[in-house]
Every structure is written in structure tokens, then in C-alpha cells.
């Protein structure tokens, strides 16, 4: 049986700012809805990835922002990825 990771929750303090950041570095904004009062769910996916990240408000996530620091991103060209991040204004 194949097991695949499809969604990783990332705690953030500012949902709009986080969404803008991920869009700026090239992620697709797949979903941004408030299914109920006090809840907002945002799903972002890097181009070519089968795994997305999710964040929002009212989701019951208990991790403090900044503690999710072990996500591994695989790219075919690290130098090109680094250049893309720098061009998007990310400090490396």
C-alpha cells in the first residue's frame, strides 16, 4: 500500500500575510474559505507538488507559530530555487 502525505498544517499568526508570502514565492492558492464563524481554512500547494500546506484560524492547531520548522522541500535545482526565493524578497 502506498502512503502519501497530502497536507501539512503550519501554524501562523497572520493568515493574510502568510497567504501573500506563499503566493509571492510561487505557491498556488487552492482554497481559502470560512466554513463557519471564527474558522478560516487556507490551502496552498507548491507547483508540481502532491502535498499542500494549510493554515488558518479556528482550526484547533496547538503548535505555536514558528515551531513547524522541519518541512523538507525537494527541488531539482537548489541554486535556481534559491534565486527564485531571493527574487521574491525572501531573506536567505
Q: What residue spans do the PLM features occupy?
A:
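Vicinal oxygen chelate
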Residues: 1, 7, 12-16, 32-33, 40-43, 47-49, 65-92, ...
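Structural motif
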Residues: 24-25, 88
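Conserved short beta-strand elements that form part of the metal-binding/catalytic scaffold
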Residues: 28-66
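Small-side-chain structural scaffolding
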Residues: 8, 18, 42, 54-56, ...
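A generic short-segment signal for beta-strand/edge and adjacent turn/coil regions
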Residues: 10-14, 23-24, 37-44, 61-62, ...
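N-terminal beta-strand motif that seeds the catalytic metal site of vicinal oxygen chelate
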Residues: 1-19, 25, 69-71
Amino acid at each position: 500500500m502506498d502512503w502519501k502525505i497530502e497536507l501539512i498544517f503550519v501554524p501562523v499568526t497572520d493568515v493574510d500575510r502568510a497567504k501573500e508570502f506563499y503566493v509571492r514565492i510561487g505557491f498556488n492558492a487552492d482554497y481559502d474559505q470560512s466554513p463557519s464563524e471564527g474558522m478560516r481554512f487556507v490551502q496552498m500547494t507548491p507547483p508540481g507538488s502532491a502535498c499542500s500546506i494549510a493554515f488558518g484560524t479556528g482550526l484547533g492547531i496547538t503548535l505555536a507559530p514558528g515551531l513547524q520548522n522541519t518541512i523538507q522541500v525537494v527541488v531539482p535545482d537548489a541554486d535556481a530555487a534559491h534565486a527564485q526565493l531571493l527574487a521574491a524578497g525572501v531573506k536567505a
